[in-house]
């Protein structure tokens, strides 16, 4: 879906289906955040008795014969002194939902007086564009009759005429092509999004962008590389596993390389340690880490960032069956480290472990960042609005946190408590794949950290179990797959690595 973007002054704007008018909240009452004609004030003045201008508040009104737009949306931005990028992002996401429900296809968005805010026009426009694009999206459905909302087709920002506005919107569109790819993959039936499908998507990206190369390992090649942990998880599945390696060379003269790893469990039944039905019903989303990496590569190649990045996706189902891997058995990873299986439902860390080992052997990484819907414990800890992350490097952790703050994709650093590491002890192997029934997210991260062995590489593990998929709309995300992480990581790489 291509969303047309333009800019105009108030007097020279074209007709549109709707106009979005901004308001501050002052002393619990709505205050105009921009100057408009008296004809518009006549439309909304009576509505202000029930509209306070608080963050994300909207009121839907109809215009009259004297207004260019026949539908008017009042949008609250909250107190002007408290407005943040996240405020703007969520407010315009909410406005987009209102506009689409009203079947608007063209919209004029009047900017507030930005001089009253603590940040720049560029920052405001970036978050406005992200808010609109985030909810100008329909998840795949399977109804006989299409019930999805119509898309916005044209947005005109009123009150500024500048080259920077068009540049910002084009950049955000490239970013959201990656976000939409991530969402679509997570939202689509698990029977369709198999490991082979993920491999096909990676091949498609490499075909679209000359800057991308792809390498696909099948089961035979996986076994040849001695990835015994990935091979173990794949044993019970009717679909074949794939190990996907994407390579982006944006700066051939640099030795700096970021490796992004995404957990690609295309459906997680729990294996022989079978999940209850209620816990299994959303498990097509267990490949959200893989989808995030693919979305990042789509945006990365489109934006042509001058950095070097490798993406690794270990992809398999975790199925129940007579050949499925078994609890109590021991399997050996790529580097020879052995793992006793305490639970077949702790499979994500196994396939990530082989991916980390592969990255260290072949990619010479400066840093490794992995994405995984890894633990229910993280959802219990931080809910669905914040992803927990672990890092062995303070600079990497600081930079990720800053990128998180600036994009509104909330990350919270969690501790790597070495005191908990003995919980992974096994009498018959180098380690177990689960700890005790406490600190589950931490022991999962400690498990992954062991596969770094003595390598000093900077590493971060993002547990996106809560943030990747929402069963109800939560601004600025739609219902179901969110695409969380794509914008944050692109911003991180652009700000801190593109030098």
UniProtKB/Swiss-Prot annotation:
SUPFAM superfamilies: Macro domain-like, Zn-dependent exopeptidases. The keyword Metal-binding applies. GO terms for biological process: proteolysis. It catalyses: Release of an N-terminal amino acid, Xaa-|-Yaa-, in which Xaa is preferably Leu, but may be other amino acids including Pro although not Arg or Lys, and Yaa may be Pro. Amino acid amides and methyl esters are also readily hydrolyzed, but rates on arylamides are exceedingly low; Release of an N-terminal amino acid, preferentially leucine, but not glutamic or aspartic acids. Signal peptide: none annotated. GO terms for cellular component: cytoplasm. Mn(2+) 1 binds at residues 268, 345, 347. It comes from the Bacteria. Its EC number is 3.4.11.1, 3.4.11.10. Coiled coil: none annotated. The active site is at 275, 349. CDD domains: Peptidase_M17. Belongs to the peptidase M17 family. This is Probable cytosol aminopeptidase.
